[in-house]
Amino acid sequence: MLLAAASLIAILTVLSNGASAGALDRIRQDRAIRIAYREDAPPFSYKNNIGEPAGFMVDLCRAVAKKLTQQLQMPNLSVVYVPVTAASRFAAIEQNKADLLCEPTSATLSRREQVDFSIPTYLDGASLMIRADGPRDLQAMAGREIGVLDNTTTEQMLRRTLKDAGITADVILTKTHAEGLALLDDGKIAAYFADRDILTSLINGSKAPEKLAVADNYLTVEPYALALAHGDEDFRLAVDRALSHIYRSGEIGPIFQQAFSGKAKPSPILQVLYVISGLPD
């Protein structure tokens, strides 16, 4: 009887270990890390003019992958890029199609029921992209159409903000930020709601940037982080260790400059974020 019980415990232990085998085991086996990225969310995660993944979050994940080569002692670790959309991004992590989600992902408590998050990677806030000849603030949007990307925390926050302010407006859902820009350019919506840095990038890449502007006020605060599989503590620790080294060593500066511009540097609040978030070994 005791032998049978011991055998059962041994079997359950093996099965438990197998079930909890996470990203690090797969990375070691395949000698590759799979990075999920968006094709339509500049300046954080997008496909550039020559069809390559680019943006701040993508560059940051490349730096994380480089740190993992040192942690795992795998100098030939390769990076595989997995394109995702705003709608499919979390499913890619949950269904084990990607190891790390590298795009402007807002870390929220409700999302932590689906995935785990790294230490913070960025801080942004949502606002309105408006036409220079149109209404310029949220109060002036009553009875008008406001575009927002579908299936995002930004959409939820827009609806909540309108409700709290007692403003009745039509919320127009878009599949991509580019679609929102086109609707605003064509006068089909009065404003487009998204994170400010994304809006600034959209304006810079538009056909007539002088006709567009970003409203002055922040309507939300969005802390970004890298998403990974729920419950994969070993991988999250490895990612957090990599990010902490990047923050504490100052490597985050060149990564930031490459993504935004040669002279750009993190804002004072971002600098504080990186100092606080970078954990010692």
PLM regions and their residue ranges:
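Beta->alpha turn/N-cap motifs
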Residues: 37-41, 82-87, 96-108, 149-153, ...
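Periplasmic-binding protein-like
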Residues: 39-40, 121-132, 196, 203-243, ...
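Short helix-initiation/N-cap motifs at beta->coil->alpha
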Residues: 74-91, 133, 172-182, 220-222
